[in-house]
Curated annotation (Swiss-Prot):
Residue spans of biased composition, Basic and acidic residues class: 254-269
Name of the protein described by the UniProt record: Vacuolar membrane protein VIN13_4115
Residues that span the membrane, as ranges: 93-113
Sequence segments annotated as region (Disordered): 32-60, 240-309
Taxonomic source organism: Saccharomyces cerevisiae (strain VIN 13)
Places the protein is found: Vacuole membrane
Length: 314
C-alpha cells in the first residue's frame, strides 16, 4: 500500500486592516463665535483607502470680549511737578555730572595756582629782606632803598643795629686774632724745634678758650678809638705769659693752614716765644732775649694728661 503525502487544505481568508480613527479639535478666538468639535473618522482598507469625515456644528453661538487698558503718560503742559524734557538735549544727566566734576577740578587748579603764587611772593619777600640786611652799610647809603621797600622804621632800626654789631665784632676780632689756634707754615724764619711732640688737644683747647673769652666780652658796644682797650688787652697777654710754661713743647704747623697777616699773629708769638711768621725786629729780639724763669722740665705725656684733666691751662 503506497502512502501518499497528506497535504491539509488551508483556506486563506482575507481580512481588513484595523481602521484608524483620528479626532481633531479646533477653537477660534474669543471674540468670534466658537465652533463645535469636529470629529473625523476614516476607514481604510487595502489596497484602497476610504475615508469619511463628518462635521457637525451647533446651532447656538456665544461671544466674549477682553478690555485692555492703554497707558498714556501725563501731559507736562502746565504741570510744575514734571520736568518738561521735550526741549532738553539728550544726556542731560551726564552733562550735569560732568559739569560738577569739571568744576571740582577747576577749583583745585585755581587753589594750586594761588598757593604757588603766594608762596613764591613770600619767598621773594624774605630773600629781599635778607639781601637788604646783608647789603646794608649805613643809613645814608641805603635810605632810599629802605624807604621804597614795604618795611617800617623798626625794621630799618633793626638792620642798623645788626650792622653796628657786626662792625663791633669785626673791630674786636682784629685784636682777638692773637688767640687764634691756626699756625702758618709759609715762613722763612721758622724756629728750630727742640721737641717732636705734637699735642692733638692744643688746637681744641685754644679754640674753646678764645670762644669763652669772646662770649665774656660785650660785643654790642662799639668803641671808635681802639687805643682805649689796647692796654687792657696787653695786660691780659702778659698775665697769660706768666701762666704758660715756656719750656713745654711747641706746636707743629699743619700744611693745610694758610698764612695770616703778621700783625694778627703778634699775640700768638708773644705767648709761645716763637718768631714764626715774624720779621726779626727790635721788639721780637728783646722779647726772646729776656731771661726765662727756671721751670722743672715736664714730660710730654704728663703735660697731655694735665691738659685733659684740666690741671694745666693752655
Amino acid at each position: 500500500m503506497v502512502k501518499k503525502n497528506f497535504i491539509p487544505s488551508v483556506s486563506l481568508v482575507r481580512r481588513d486592516l484595523p481602521t484608524l480613527v483620528t479626532t481633531t479639535t479646533s477653537s477660534t478666538a474669543l471674540s468670534k463665535p466658537t465652533s463645535s468639535v469636529v470629529s473625523e473618522t476614516s476607514s481604510k482598507s487595502l489596497p484602497s483607502l476610504t475615508s469619511s469625515a463628518f462635521s457637525t456644528s451647533s446651532g447656538a453661538t456665544s461671544s466674549s470680549s477682553l478690555i485692555v487698558a492703554s497707558i498714556t503718560p501725563p501731559s507736562t503742559a502746565g504741570n510744575p511737578f514734571i520736568l518738561n524734557a521735550a526741549d532738553k538735549p539728550n544726556g542731560t544727566v551726564y552733562i550735569a555730572v560732568g559739569a560738577v566734576i569739571g568744576a571740582i577740578f577747576i577749583s583745585i587748579l585755581i587753589w594750586w595756582l594761588v598757593s604757588s603764587y603766594l608762596s613764591r611772593r613770600f619767598t621773594m619777600t624774605n630773600s629781599y629782606a635778607n639781601d637788604s640786611k646783608n647789603l646794608y652799610r649805613g643809613h645814608h647809603k641805603h635810605s632810599s632803598s629802605l624807604q621804597s621797600n614795604p618795611f617800617d622804621i623798626n625794621d630799618e632800626k633793626s638792620y642798623m643795629q645788626d650792622d653796628w654789631d657786626s662792625m663791633s665784632q669785626l673791630e674786636s676780632s682784629q685784636y682777638e686774632d692773637a688767640a687764634s689756634p691756626f699756625n702758618p707754615i709759609q715762613d722763612p724764619f721758622t724756629d728750630x724745634r727742640r721737641s717732636l711732640f705734637i699735642s692733638p688737644t692744643l688746637q681744641v683747647s685754644q679754640y674753646e678758650k678764645s670762644h669763652s673769652r669772646h662770649q665774656s666780652k660785650d660785643t654790642n658796644i662799639f668803641i671808635d678809638d681802639p687805643s682805649l682797650y689796647v692796654g687792657t688787652y696787653l695786660e691780659e697777654e702778659e698775665e697769660e705769659e706768666r701762666k704758660l710754661n715756656l719750656n713745654r713743647p711747641q706746636r707743629a704747623a699743619s700744611p693745610e693752614r694758610k698764612e695770616k697777616k703778621i700783625n694778627s699773629m703778634e699775640g700768638y708769638h708773644k705767648r709761645n716765644q716763637s718768631s714764626l711768621g715774624l720779621i726779626p725786629v727790635a721788639s721780637a729780639t728783646s722779647n726772646t732775649s729776656s731771661p726765662k724763669k727756671a721751670h722743672k722740665r715736664q714730660a710730654p705725656s704728663m703735660f697731655l694728661d694735665d691738659v685733659l684733666n684740666g690741671r694745666e691751662i693752655i
